């Protein structure tokens, strides 16, 4: 009897597996009629998934592109994904045919925290998206509001420096700078959302924790997009459960603050409420801004510090550039001085080139039947833009894997090509709406941290690990610990 039950169970498993295989083959047959760009050889059922392990995905795809071309097709199981990696193909997708590629390929699991794809970065282009983006970029992220934020952000930098000094004093001179910078970014985002006068450290600390926790589950979305039947896997079900748990945390955290706020018209909440959006959409849009903005400038500034710990000459050049502008004045580097610091701007650009915060951008999807460099691309095709590969293209950049800020001080041959090959915020219709405030936050933080402290390794002879970890953004796989010494004790 037990043997019969076992055989029946095995037979059922085989039947299910066979059914999945048949469905896969039928769907694959329809895809095979399309002439996709070339790519690595595939295996049945899994496509190219076996080739995407090891390094982080953007690095793996860059290596594959060197073999199979700057426009290649990667099969995530039965799903074709076109990956573009050079200047011409990236520019066509992002700029020349921006509207053709402006749809989004959002994972189902992401809809849990995005009000069913009603946030800026998850919604397709169209009237709703245009209204939402215009409200963000003309209001809280507009030039007037950013200018109004500058004195507040400068005072916040004084707080960051003071808290770093206290942290170092309590820990033998060693700190984790990312923690301090993230808290500063969270405070900035909160002011953009709720208005300049918003000041609520318990709320900001709680939001920081929620974002940190949710970042750990970024890979679940990729799993779902790779396998249509991933929803039946235990790991995916656990991920969905975690997303729902965090959705409730977000609601419980944001809802009372929204209810008690009287936001100014130039705040994000003020705009969202003026459109009479549902509470679910308002909370989703607010959380998205934290998710995308909280870590980006903080992580990029931390990468820059790590590069300068590894190359003390770069750090000294930057310090001298700062002193050239502000002289012997002790105190804060002001935002108005940043544009005069040419080497600072070079370090900022080189850091964003080496470690783009979103190395694969956010996956695009064709909104219509279109073409790419002469090859037909059907509507609904997922297209990934590998900004990491673009920023490390040896045909454009000299010694692309070496940190050399000087490359941005003296133009290389082919000026226009170099400019088109440097796209840390993307380009075209879907360019990052927070580009200007992000650059300001990064530059202001870096200038002040190098002006206030000399940065060295936490342990003598142990340089920072520069390995990437791709979550929703690129972070340091090993969080930076550094020893700081005040320059003006």
Curated annotation (Swiss-Prot):
Pathway: Aromatic compound metabolism; phenylpropanoid biosynthesis. GO terms for molecular function: heme binding; iron ion binding; monooxygenase activity; oxidoreductase activity, acting on paired donors, with incorporation or reduction of molecular oxygen. The chain crosses the membrane at residues 6-26. It is an enzyme of class 1 (oxidoreductase). GO terms for biological process: phenylpropanoid biosynthetic process. It is a single-pass membrane protein. It catalyses: (-)-matairesinol + reduced [NADPH--hemoprotein reductase] + O2 = (-)-pluviatolide + oxidized [NADPH--hemoprotein reductase] + 2 H2O + H(+). Its EC number is 1.14.19.72. It is found in: Membrane. GO terms for cellular component: membrane. Its cofactor is heme. It holds the Pfam family p450. Keywords: Heme, Iron, Membrane, Metal-binding, Oxidoreductase, Transmembrane, Transmembrane helix. Heme binds at residue 432. Cytochrome P450 involved in the biosynthesis of etoposide, a chemotherapeutic compound of the topoisomerase inhibitor family. Catalyzes the conversion of matairesinol to pluviatolide. Belongs to the cytochrome P450 family. This is Pluviatolide synthase. The gene is CYP719A24.
């Amino acid at each position: 009897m037990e043997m019969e039950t076992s055989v029946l169970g095995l037979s059922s498993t085989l039947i299910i597996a066979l059914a999945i295989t048949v469905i896969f083959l039928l769907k694959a047959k329809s895809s095979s009629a399309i002439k996709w760009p070339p790519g690595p050889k595939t295996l049945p059922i899994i496509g190219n998934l076996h080739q995407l392990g090891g390094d982080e995905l953007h690095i793996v795809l860059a290596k594959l592109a060197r073999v199979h071309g700057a426009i290649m097709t990667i099969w995530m199981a039965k799903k074709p994904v076109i990956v573009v990696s050079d200047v011409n193909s990236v520019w066509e997708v992002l700029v020349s045919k921006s509207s053709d590629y402006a749809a989004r390929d959002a994972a189902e699991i992401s809809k849990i925290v995005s009000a069913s794809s009603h946030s800026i970065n998850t919604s397709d282009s169209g009237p709703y998206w245009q209204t939402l983006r215009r409200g963000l970029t003309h209001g809280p992220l507009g030039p007037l509001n950013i200018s109004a934020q500058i004195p507040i952000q400068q005072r916040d930098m004084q707080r960051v420096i003071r808290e770093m000094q206290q942290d170092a004093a309590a820990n033998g001179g060693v700190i984790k700078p990312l923690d301090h910078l993230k808290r500063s970014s969270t405070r900035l985002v909160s002011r953009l959302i709720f208005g300049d006068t918003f000041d609520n450290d318990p709320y900001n600390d709680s939001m920081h924790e929620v974002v940190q926790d949710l970042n750990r589950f970024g890979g679940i979305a990729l799993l779902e997009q790779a396998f249509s039947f991933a929803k039946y896997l235990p790991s995916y079900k656990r991920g969905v459960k975690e997303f729902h748990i965090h959705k409730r945390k977000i609601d419980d955290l944001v809802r009372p603050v929204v209810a008690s706020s009287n936001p100014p018209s130039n705040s994000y909440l003020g705009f969202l409420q003026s459109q009479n959006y549902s509470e679910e959409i308002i909370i989703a849009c607010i959380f998205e801004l934290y998710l995308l903005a909280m870590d980006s400038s903080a992580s990029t500034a931390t990468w820059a510090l790590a590069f300068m710990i590894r190359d003390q000459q770069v750090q000294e050049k930057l310090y001298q550039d700062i002193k050239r502008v502000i002289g012997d004045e002790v105190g804060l580097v002001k935002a108005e001085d940043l544009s005069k610091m040419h080497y600072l701007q070079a370090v900022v650009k080189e850091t964003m080139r080496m470690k783009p915060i979103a190395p694969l951008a956010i996956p695009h999807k064709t909104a219509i039947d279109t073409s790419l460099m002469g090859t037909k691309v059907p509507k609904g095709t997922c297209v990934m833009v590998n900004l990491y590969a673009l920023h490390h293209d040896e045909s454009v950049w000299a010694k692309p894997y070496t940190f050399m800020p000087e490359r941005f001080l003296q133009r290389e041959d082919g000026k226009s090509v170099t400019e088109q090959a440097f796209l840390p915020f993307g380009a075209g219709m879907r360019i990052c709406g927070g580009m200007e405030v992000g650059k300001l936050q990064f530059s202001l933080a870096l200038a002040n941290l190098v002006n206030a402290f000399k940065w060295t390794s936490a342990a003598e002879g142990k340089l920072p690990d520069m390995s990437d970890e791709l979550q929703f953004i690129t972070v340091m796989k090993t969080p930076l610990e550094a020893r700081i010494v005040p320059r003006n004790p």
